[in-house]
Regions:
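Long, compositionally biased intrinsically disordered regions
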Residues: 219-220
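Catalytic cores of eukaryotic secretory-pathway lumenal/extracellular enzymes that build
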Residues: 1-216
Length: 220
């Protein structure tokens, strides 16, 4: 399916771009692989995408037109029907929060500033990618990136934001055989637990939760 994603990017991107594909044959994990690819990237901006996504026409130039040095930006998210390679436009997801266990939840609301991002596709400057330590390998190999993105942005004076100028479809996997890990050994659980250990009583997180209307009573 990664091949179809690359083909889709090549069909719909309109600017000056390069596609770097991570084939994690040595099992170093998604964060480590992202860091390897980010170091190889030659542009000023990096867009991370999962290998099972499709994109709207000109998504790259439209996203870059909205970028600044304080933002992690994501296109409007919709489910992808991978069998037909078609986007289900009836379910649009633009707002995301993380709960008191630092697990992402989809929230109601339109595009704009958001507490965090779903994590399957987003754009950041290369400088902020490394300066904010977006893919912190101490959080484990995979998972928990929604809260990680929100924390990295907001606690470094930046923000997370979604936009309607571009959109993408993402395959939401449900069956055990579709996941890149054993469901009983979910590395994402380590990531969210570690984020909770580090930040649960951080006043900046409490203020962030208040900003997005999240109850802080379970954080204390």
């Amino acid at each position: 399916m990664a091949d179809k994603t690359v083909e889709d990017i090549n069909q719909h991107a309109e600017g000056d771009f390069e596609v770097l594909v991570g084939n994690d044959v040595n099992g170093i994990g998604q964060r480590a692989m992202m860091n390897v690819l980010a170091k190889q990237a030659t542009g000023d901006y990096i867009m991370k995408t999962d290998g099972h996504c499709s994109f709207s026409q000109g998504f790259d130039v439209k996203l870059l037109a909205e970028m600044d040095d304080k933002t992690i930006l994501a296109p409007l998210l919709m489910p992808l029907d991978a069998d037909n390679w078609a986007i289900n436009g009836k379910k649009q997801m633009a707002q995301f929060v993380f709960d008191d266990n630092f697990v992402m939840q989809h929230a109601e609301g339109d595009v704009g500033e958001t507490m965090c991002l779903q994590g399957s596709a987003w754009v950041i400057s290369k400088e902020n990618y490394f300066g904010w330590n977006v893919c912190d390998e101490s959080l484990g190999s995979w998972g928990g990136q929604a809260a990680e993105l929100g924390i990295a942005a907001w606690l470094n004076g930046g923000r997370c934001k979604t936009t309607r100028s571009a959109y993408y479809g993402h395959l939401f996997r449900h069956k055990d055989e579709e996941f890149p890990y054993e469901r009983g050994e979910d590395p994402g659980k380590f990531a969210t637990q570690e984020l909770k250990r580090r930040y649960r009583n951080d006043q900046r997180i409490l203020e962030l939760r208040k900003k997005f209307g999240i109850d802080n009573k379970n954080m204390l």
